[in-house]
C-alpha cells in the first residue's frame, strides 16, 4: 500500500526501470508519513560520491513533534540501494537524457521504502498525446455507460 504517490512523474517522464530503495529517516518523519503528511511531487534524485540522495521532498512535521529538535521538512534524505544497483544507475544517469525520479513511498515489512525510476523526460508533444489518450479513454467510458 502506497503512502504518497508522484502522479506527475508518469505525465512528465517515460518510465524505463523501477527500483525499490530504503530511506534514511528520522523518527518524526516516519510519524508524519504515517499521518499522510508528505509530498514528493517536487522531489528528485541525485548521485553524489557514489551515493544516492532524495532532494526536494517535503515531509511536514506533526504539531506534537519534539520541542528539543527543529525539524527541517525539506532536508536531503539518503536512499539505500545495493552497490551494484547504484553503479548501474550511475552509468545510466550519465547517459544523455536519463534522470532518476521518485514514484512513491510505501511500507514494506514495517519500513518506509521509496520506488525510484530511471526515466527520460517527455517532450511537450508527448505530454499532449498522453492527455489526448486519457481524454479519449474517459470519453469512451462515458459513451459505454450511456449506451447501456
Curated annotation (Swiss-Prot):
Q: Which Gene3D superfamilies match?
A: 2.40.280.10
Coiled-coil positions are none
A family per Pfam:
SmpB
Single GO molecular-function term?
RNA binding
The record's listing under InterPro entries reads:
SmpB, SsrA-bd_prot, SsrA-bd_prot_CS
Keyword line: Cytoplasm, RNA-binding
SUPFAM superfamilies in alphabetical order: Small protein B (SmpB)
Compositional bias ranges of the Basic and acidic residues kind: 129-142
Coarse class of the protein's main subcellular location:
cytoplasm
Q: What is this protein called?
A: SsrA-binding protein
Q: What is the species listed in this Swiss-Prot or TrEMBL entry?
A: Burkholderia cenocepacia (strain HI2424)
Q: Which gene produces this protein? A: smpB
Amino acid at each position: 500500500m502506497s503512502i504518497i504517490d508522484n502522479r506527475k512523474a508518469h505525465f512528465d517522464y517515460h518510465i524505463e526501470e523501477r527500483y525499490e530503495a530504503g530511506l534514511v529517516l528520522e523518527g518524526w518523519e516516519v510519524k508524519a508519513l504515517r499521518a499522510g503528511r508528505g509530498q514528493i511531487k517536487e522531489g528528485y534524485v541525485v548521485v553524489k560520491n557514489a551515493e544516492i540522495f532524495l532532494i526536494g521532498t517535503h515531509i511536514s512535521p506533526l504539531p506534537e513533534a519534539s520541542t528539543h529538535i527543529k525539524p527541517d521538512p525539506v532536508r536531503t534524505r539518503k536512499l539505500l540501494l545495493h552497490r551494484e544497483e547504484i553503479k548501474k544507475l550511475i552509468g545510466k544517469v550519465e547517459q544523455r537524457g536519463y534522470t532518476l525520479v521518485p514514484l512513491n513511498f510505501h511500507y514494506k515489512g514495517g519500513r518506509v521504502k521509496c520506488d525510484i525510476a530511471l526515466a527520460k523526460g517527455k517532450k511537450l508533444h508527448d505530454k499532449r498525446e498522453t492527455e489526448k489518450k486519457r481524454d479519449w479513454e474517459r470519453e469512451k467510458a462515458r459513451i459505454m455507460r450511456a449506451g447501456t
